[in-house]
Amino acid sequence: MVGGEDFTHGNTLIFDAERDAFLYTPKFLDAIVAVGRQSGALNWQAGGRFGSFTDEDGDTIDPDRAYDVDGPNRTWWSHAHMSHAWADGFVLYDNGTHHSPLVSRVAAYTWDVEAATLKRTFEFVNESGIYDPILGDVRKLDGGNYLVAWTMSGSMTEITPAGEVVWRMSVELGSGVGRTGYVPTLYQVTYQ
């Protein structure tokens, strides 16, 4: 596509029951958009060139600089995958395609959708400086830790809110871990 972006390449689609909307992250727009389930209308956009949200410093992304994704406090993201959102926040896997140096990270945010503001509350970069140009995923676990799939390295980690790695897994095949989820047990245990 000459002079344009593939806006239909969606990395994520999540249903937000509280707002009766779908949250969609189009890869090349570097944004999160909310689309009304009933109306199909664009409710709002966070991030990207034309996003209406501001960060904690009041910064937005200049529409004339499409890839000014970091902002003064590295608030923004690039080519992210967001699999987990809740009423006042979300966590995403920031592929980091427009960061310098190229490095992927986990970033969690609080947001106020009505005020159109967001604040980064957590950031973690893998100690080996992994850059995943594709895929990657993160979920916030019930206890507050984050479960991360570092796709290209074929590894997963569980990270505390303090940034401590408490669990790690690697697969011999390399880039074989895409989306992640937590399964508490593979067995249903019943006692008589």
Where are these regions (language model features)?
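Histidine-/acidic-rich catalytic cores in large beta-rich domains
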Residues: 1-192
